Amino acid sequence: MALDIDTAALLLDQLGNQTRLRIVRLLVRAGEEGRTVGDLQRAIEIPASTLSHHLSHLRSAGLVWQERQGTVLNCFVAFKKVSELVDFLTAECCVDVPAGNVHRRAAG
């Protein structure tokens, strides 16, 4: 299902925080394996309470989900939600540019 502008804005608001963006990027890199809360805490070097706060925001937005396995809490990125956000951002790419006038500029 395509995102509406309000949902996209909420997701972008959550990703506008550097720590949350770092968490999501680490989880994207981890793929389907995810990462434990302890791994995330060591990678980002923040207190457990701060990490918990940011994970709560990401879970509420549907960008991250967690699964407990015994005493270990694993975190995973919601790939479908992230993909929907990327699709929302690029859905109308270049629609206002006349055909034949689309030029890609090198980054930098």
Language model: regions and residue ranges:
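Conserved catalytic-core motifs of GNAT/GCN5-like acyltransferases
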Residues: 67-69, 98-99
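Short glycine/serine/threonine-biased micro-segments
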Residues: 14, 54, 60, 68
